[in-house]
Every structure is written in structure tokens, then in C-alpha cells.
Amino acid sequence: MSLPSYYITTPIYYVNDVPHIGHAYTTLACDVMARFKRLDGYNVLFLTGTDEHGQKVEIAAGKHGLEPQLFTDQVSQNFRDLLPALDISNDDFIRTTEQRHKVAAQVIWQKLFDNGHIYRDKYSGWYSVRDEAYFTESELIDGKAPTGAPVSWVEEESYFFNLSNWQDTLLEF
């Protein structure tokens, strides 16, 4: 009897800068788990990759005088090159700009939307691009995020995941 499949993934890393020790650490931790599970007979799928969207990426590309896609192509390759340098045993490397990712994301999004798990609403608040986080007025220090990053007031419509639909399931977990 074969053991069940085991799926493990690193975060998909933002390509706004070169890889650093934190990227190496999380990738190595996933690699250790993937290797252990393989030795234990599991059918492992170990995924890593890069997230090539967002304000941080757009800003970083602009600072380098490059179009975002060219910039992400270059930086994503740095992340890909890290894997053999660390002898990482990943099975796949995904880029959010790849067609296969776009199609899968759209299918999942549509299923969630059709089942009432995603809804559209408005939000506003003090946002830090660097921290990728919102802060309340009381959290700001001299008009900046607690990390010292600049913030700007943002008001926009967005989609939200209806987490309350999953409350009972999560509490039982």
C-alpha cells in the first residue's frame, strides 16, 4: 500500500530584490521536509517559485529603469539559480507570470466566487508599500509605519475572502 501524496511549498518569493538568507532558510526548511517525506515513502510534490506582481515589483523595476516583465525575468532567474547552489530538491518552479499559473488562479478564483467565498467591498487605511501592510492611526509613529516606512492613505474597492464561512470548519480543525 502506498502512502498518500504530500505537498509542500515555499512562499512564492517577491522579485523586488535579490534572494537573501531568509529565502535560503525557508527553501532549505521545505527541502528537508520534502526529503524526509520521500525517504518515508510519500509521493512528494515540492513547489517553489516567484511572485511577480505588486507595487513593490513595479517600483523596483522603475528604479532599475526596466519594464516590470524584463526586471522580473532577471530577478526570477536569481531565485532559480539559488536552488542548485543549495542542492534543493524541488519538483517544480512556478512564476506568477506564467500562463499555467494565470489559468489555475482564474479557475480557483471563479470557483471561490461562484460559491460565495469571495465578495467585493471597499476598504481604506494607511498603507505601507514596503511592509505590504495597513496600519491604524494609533499605530503610526510620526506619520510613519512602526517600521519607519512611509505610509499613504489608500481607499479602493477590492475583493475579500469570506473567512467567516469557514469558521466552524477551522474551529474543528
Where are the language model's segments positioned?
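N-terminal, positively charged nucleic-acid-binding surface of large information/translation enzymes
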Residues: M1-F173
